[in-house]
Curated annotation (Swiss-Prot):
Mg(2+) binds at D101, G128. This is Adenylosuccinate synthetase 2, chloroplastic. The keyword Plastid applies. It catalyses: IMP + L-aspartate + GTP = N(6)-(1,2-dicarboxyethyl)-AMP + GDP + phosphate + 2 H(+). Plays an important role in the de novo pathway and in the salvage pathway of purine nucleotide biosynthesis. Catalyzes the first committed step in the biosynthesis of AMP from IMP. Substrate binds at T387, T388, T389, G390, R391, P392, R393. Homodimer. It comes from Physcomitrium patens. GTP binds at residues 100-106, 128-130, 393, 419-421, 502-504. SUPFAM superfamilies: P-loop containing nucleoside triphosphate hydrolases. Residues 1-56 form a transit peptide. The active site is at D101, H129. Its main location: plastid.
Length: 514
């Protein structure tokens, strides 16, 4: 029905190209495509580039409305952002589309002002989010959800997260030293698994064992902790309430590590010292511990708005990423259901966050990677050093093949394109639009076989660059024409709107594209 409605609009000539006179008095379309809704987004309809027509959808009925330039300017800024954000469903998720470091934290921080609960569903301290408050103060978070800066938001660390308590408390102390109150606003799942220092030590031993085939782990102990969970000798947050059996479970972890790695040595004194720490940790963590599955689902039933913050990104997903150069959890949409206990039919909007180019920390295939001076320039322009590790990130052009793959898996309803400003000043920009084998065969989909992925030749589409500094731009129609063409070409190739466009690190450096 939505398609028929759109066709009816088009047949009436409402999407016709404007005359030269109309161009002077009318605004360039805020978006070169219109989105129609009937409960969910069903259709992405291209419209002309220079028309002065906006489309509104109510159910499956569409209405065309001329948009005058002055009216667009009057509606720019906060009112336009409010309209875009208020349209989000009750349960909304923000997920990474690449290899992490896309800038998810910033969008979550902005959206959190409009949601009652912000929840993390997977990963651990290997996921780093850098956000800024209204004063411009920088916060690097690893376990605490990004919504913590919004004082009316409750933050949830779900059952799918692995928690290193020393690091968790350090984040809390840092937040409170800067005036951020976490009391009653930060909840930790009683089902979440605890990550111990021994997991971090084992992580390093495992990497050393692999020698030349290192995965490039952050050495934060994430993989070993999830391994403990999988073989069912992990220790959960709820175990802190049973200290009489805690020591025995801790002993098992140490014995298993020593049996697996000859270089892992420990003494009973070391285990005793660790036990003493966790007796204190148990007391401090107790006020934060709740059954988050019950809490989140009760909040949904009460009509509260839930925002889910994914850590890392789909190209690092243990099932769908470039295995084995991946993380140990599911940073894709499935991880929301298993990591929070939220049913699939409860999920509404799912926003995928993608850089206007790509970056990756650590080892693994990376088809569009730039080497030498080109890669160095992009790294410097984007300040591409890992939030968690401090390691320089590998940088390259936007990979449309990989992006289409993750869009299919996650069912994104919109894209947040970040760091568009980093590409300013380049004479040309490229999009990796297809993979070919050395024999010239074009691949239909993103390959699972790394031996194929490592040999693919990328087919690029070259677009004109732009010289202008766009960090002060807050309206889409004020972007340089070349920047708009770049955004719109991405939309055409992935079949989704780039509804949010980042043009700088600050909270306000965001264009909401209607």
């Amino acid at each position: 029905m939505a398609m028929a409605a759109a066709a009816a609009v088009a047949s009436q000539g409402l999407l016709a190209t404007s005359s030269q006179q109309q161009k002077k008095s009318s605004a360039k379309l805020i978006c070169n495509a219109a989105t129609f809704f009937s409960g969910k987004r069903l259709l992405w309809v291209k419209s002309c580039n220079n028309g002065a027509v906006g489309l509104r959808a109510s159910g499956v009925r569409c209405e065309a409305q001329a948009i005058e330039r002055e009216a667009v300017k009057a509606d720019a800024g906060n009112s336009r952002e409010e309209d875009a954000f208020s349209g989000l469903k009750q349960v909304c998720a923000v997920l990474g589309t690449q290899w992490g470091d896309e800038g998810k934290g910033k969008l979550v921080d902005i959206l959190a002002q409009r949601f009652d609960v912000v929840a993390r569903c997977q990963g651990g301290a290997n996921a780093g989010h850098t956000i800024y408050n209204d004063k411009g103060e920088k916060f690097a978070l690893h376990l605490v959800p990004s919504g913590i800066l919004n004082e009316k938001t409750t933050c949830v660390v779900g059952n799918g997260v692995v928690i290193h308590l020393p690091g968790f408390f350090k984040e809390i102390d840092n937040l409170e030293s800067k005036g951020v109150n976490t009391n009653g606003r930060l909840l930790v799942s009683d089902r979440a698994h605890l990550l111990f220092n021994l997991h971090q030590e084992v992580d390093g031993l495992r990497e050393a064992e692999l020698a030349g085939q290192m995965i490039g782990t952050t050495k934060r102990g994430i993989g070993p902790c999830y391994a403990s969970k999988a073989i069912r000798n992990g220790i959960r947050v709820s175990d802190l309430r049973h200290l009489d059996t805690f020591r025995e479970k801790l002993d098992i972890l140490y014995r298993d590590a020593a049996a697996r790695f000859k270089d892992f040595e420990y003494s009973s004194d070391e285990v005793n010292a660790e036990m003493e720490k966790y007796v204190k940790y148990a007391e401090r963590l107790e006020p934060y511990i709740v059954d988050t599955v019950d809490y989140v689902n009760a909040a949904i039933a009460e009509g509260k708005r839930i925002l889910i913050e994914g850590g890392q990104a789909t190209m690092l997903d243990i099932d769908f990423g470039t295995y084995p150069f991946v993380t140990s959890s599911n940073p894709s949409v499935g991880g929301i259901c298993t990591g929070l206990g939220v049913a699939p039919n409860r999920l509404g909007d799912i926003v995928g966050v993608a850089k206007a180019y790509t970056s990756r920390v650590g080892s693994g295939p990376y088809p569009t990677e730039l080497f030498g001076e080109e890669g160095d320039e992009l790294r410097k322009a984007g300040f591409e050093w890992g939030t968690t590790t401090g390691r320089p990130r590998r940088c390259g052009w936007l990979d449309i093949v990989a992006l289409n793959f993750v869009c299919t898996i996650n069912g994104f309803t919109a894209i947040n394109l970040t760091k568009l400003d980093v590409l300013s000043g380049l004479p040309e920009v490229k999009l990796g639009i297809a993979y070919k084998t050395p024999s010239g065969e074009k691949l239909r989909a993103f390959p699972a076989d790394l031996s194929i992925l490592e040999q693919v030749e990328v087919e690029y589409e070259i677009l004109e660059g732009w010289k202008e500094d766009i960090t002060k731009v807050r309206s889409y129609d004020e972007l340089p024409a070349a920047a708009q063409r770049y955004v719109e070409r991405i939309e055409e190739l992935i079949g989704l709107p780039c509804q949010y466009i980042g043009v700088g690190p600050g909270r306000d450096a965001l264009i909401v594209k209607q």
